[in-house]
Every structure is written in structure tokens, then in C-alpha cells.
A protein has these predicted regions:
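Short Pro-Cys-Gly-centered "Cys-loop" motif that presents a nucleophilic cysteine in a tight turn
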Residues: 1-52, 66-309
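Short, charge-patterned binding micro-sites
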Residues: 52-59
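Short beta-strand->loop micro-motif that forms the acidic, two-metal-ion catalytic signature
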Residues: 59-67
Length: 309
């Protein structure tokens, strides 16, 4: 990701951002929602045309049409900086979160642009998290033609007061031009049942949805054709500086489920702050009960791999 950055006003920029220590970034819904709503607020503030994004466990992909290098750089700088502050407060850490500079590569022909967007959407498929791109929530592909792809649309008059209040609070924050922070999300999710949490998550994503559907239609012909393209090919990207990792991301999902089941995935991420002896026991347990390799456990716990060999 080193070297002079290339850009052009008519080029689709493929942006790639990974954590500095290559550790897991997105563990829970809250992590995705905070980052996604920041993307939404800041892309509108900078008037950046974003076609799509994909949140993976350790990194983020994004496809956007910037007016110039300054617009893209300022947007990415603010996004990384503001999210790092919010995330650091949540997990009790300090310092920058993402590797700098971020990776980017311009795509000037329509063929390159289509291949880039298909690659971004298909990241969860490549990492064996889903069979089809639209089955993954955090590449947001399903939301291009469906407001509630992972839940049933809530009807306010028949919904519990807790869900109605949560919806109104989210609407208020959206109208005020604010992203959703961890404290607010922890509070509202704690008052909802499992079905309502899914409904609220879908509501948040469709409300804050900021991707340029028109640009996607111009590129692929239509949204259904764009989705179909993700089923016909995986797309290819070689010039964005992405770390090569041939392994499945399923172990990360399995480890998240285990840690959550044991009550260690809540506010503050308690599992990251366990005493040394307990964390070593947790690492051993995770390796025994998932398909995780030692280096995946190390990335999950933000530790050196040599400690778990």
C-alpha cells in the first residue's frame, strides 16, 4: 500500500483498509453499525459517490467515484480517525486503528469497474462466510433492492414500545446528521428481543443507506443484473495492496459465537481484557472448539501469534 497514489476524476477508486496489527475489527453488529453510519454521514458531508462497501473481519473494501484526491483523502482520514476514537473508547485502547496509508487503485474502464465491484461484494463468498453475495449482511448487497432482507418490516402500531422508541431515536439521530455511537446502540439493543434487534438493524441500514444506486445501474444495466453478476464471477483485484490470505473467515465467526455465548462480547469487550492466564485458556479453548489456526486466534485476541503455538 506504499507509493504515490493515483487518482482521476472519472476513475472508480477501490479503497482497501486493514487494521494495523491485522487483528479483528468487526466482532458484533454494533461495530458494523457504528462504522457504516459513519460512512453514511461522512460520504454525504463530503459529497462522495460511493457505489458499495464490504466489511470483513479484519478489513474494509470500498468502491467510490471521488471528484479528486483531496476529497477521497479527507473522507478516508476523517472516517478512520473518528471511528478509531469511538472504537478505542469502547474497547479501552489507544492509538490509530488502521494501517496508513490506505490502499487504493483506480479503475477507468467499465470492465475494470464492474470487476472491482463484483470483487468487493463477493469478499464474503471468497472467505466462505456465505454461498451467495446477497446472503451476507455486511456487504449490504441485499439492501440495494430490499429494505428488510434479514427481518420482517415492523409495523409501528403493532410493535412493542421499546422498538418504536428505538426507531424514533435512530430517526432523530439520522435527521440531525449524526452517526450512531456505541453507547446508544448498547442501550437500545439491550431493551429489544432477538427479532426486534434484527428489525432495528435492517431499519438502520435502509435509513442510512448511502450507496449510489444510479451509478450502479449505469455500470451494470440494473440492480438485478449487478446482483446476478456476483453469481457469475468473483471479480479480480491485484493492485490494491491487499494482504494475501487463502484461509476461510468462518473460524472468526465461530470464535465470536463462543465468546458471546460465555458473556464476554458485551460493552467494553471483556474478553480482550482478561488476565493473562485466563486469556491463554480462552485461546486454547478456541483452537480446540473451532477450525481456527494459531494465527487466527492471535488476530482475534490481538496478540502475537508466537504465544499460541
Amino acid at each position: 500500500m506504499k507509493g504515490k497514489r493515483k487518482t482521476a476524476q472519472d476513475a472508480l477508486q477501490h479503497v482497501y483498509k486493514i487494521t494495523r496489527d491485522r487483528g479483528v475489527l468487526f466482532y458484533r453488529k454494533e461495530d458494523h453499525i457504528v462504522y457504516f453510519t459513519m460512512q453514511s454521514v461522512l460520504s454525504r458531508r463530503y459529497r462522495l459517490r460511493v457505489l458499495g462497501t464490504s466489511h470483513m473481519y479484519t478489513h474494509v473494501h470500498e468502491g467510490a467515484f471521488p471528484e479528486d484526491i483531496v476529497q477521497l483523502s479527507e473522507y478516508e482520514h476523517d472516517l478512520s480517525s473518528i471511528f478509531a476514537k469511538e472504537y478505542n473508547r469502547e474497547v479501552g485502547r489507544s492509538g490509530s486503528l488502521f494501517e496508513r496509508p490506505y490502499g487504493s487503485a483506480p479503475k477507468r474502464s467499465d470492465k475494470e469497474r464492474r470487476s472491482c465491484m463484483v470483487y468487493i461484494f463477493n469478499n464474503p463468498v471468497e472467505k466462505k462466510l456465505v454461498q451467495r453475495a446477497q446472503e451476507d449482511r455486511w456487504n449490504f448487497l441485499a439492501y440495494y433492492e430490499n429494505d428488510y432482507p434479514f427481518s420482517k418490516r415492523p409495523f409501528i402500531r403493532y410493535s412493542r414500545k421499546q422498538l418504536v422508541d428505538a426507531i424514533h431515536l435512530v430517526e432523530h439521530e439520522f435527521r440531525a446528521g449524526r452517526y450512531l455511537g456505541y453507547k446508544m446502540l448498547h442501550r437500545v439493543f439491550a431493551e429489544l428481543n432477538a427479532v426486534e434487534r434484527e428489525q432495528l438493524t435492517d431499519f438502520i441500514i435502509q435509513l442510512y443507506f448511502f450507496f449510489d444506486r444510479r451509478a450502479c445501474e449505469d455500470l451494470f444495466g440494473s440492480i438485478p443484473q449487478m446482483i446476478k453478476a456476483t453469481e457469475l464471477t468473483t471479480g479480480k483485484e491485484f493492485d490494491v495492496g491487499e494482504e494475501f490470505d487463502p484461509y476461510s473467515d468462518v473460524p472468526y465467526r465461530e470464535m465470536c459465537a463462543i465468546v458471546e455465548k460465555h458473556g464476554l462480547m458485551g460493552a467494553g469487550m471483556p474478553f480482550l481484557h482478561l488476565p493473562e492466564e485466563r486469556q491463554m485458556k480462552l485461546a486454547s479453548f478456541l483452537m480446540q472448539h473451532t477450525g481456527a489456526t494459531p494465527w487466527q486466534v492471535a488476530r482475534f485476541l490481538h496478540r502475537e501469534e508466537s504465544r499460541f503455538r
